[in-house]
Amino acid sequence: MLLSACQNVKQTQLVLFDSLSFGMSPKSFEEVFGEASQVVEEEETAYRDTWRAEDPYFYKTGRLFYHYEQITLKGYTGRARFTFSKSHRLEEVTAHFPVTSKAEQQALLFNLFQTVKKELEALPDYQSMATDTVGLYDDGYRYKVKLEGKRKELWVDVYPTEDGSVGSQVDKYTIRVDQFLMYQ
């Protein structure tokens, strides 16, 4: 009875990923999205003697990270990381879209701003949206979406990144899109 009640809970759909939603299990996620390039289980450090921080050891937290190196979303090619909680439910998504120049980065950023905003407004449980600036130079946006019947807000960050230490022009400029649910 409890299992069927949990399955009937309306889940929040992801933006840019048509058939994915927060709260999915890894099994149902893999059925929709396919096999990952790499799956990593998070490890943390703890100390047997916490007072002196001596005798460290590693333990697995249970959180899973699914890495996809070659994905195509709405005509854009990039890579993505999906984070599953300790209870193995999808809780966060990060997508990176590399471009070759600053001008191409700005054009893609503008297109993603419009695409993400349209998709958010089209969500079935969309109620309202607030927008903040994010990024080093306030050149990105954080969309905070209130959803009907939910205590959590859907937050989507879209912002440019630039890695000056990278010699390759392909990996220097990227657009990053983060999605997660946040208690408000």
Regions found by a protein language model. Give the residues of each.
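Bacterial signal peptide processing site
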Residues: 7-9
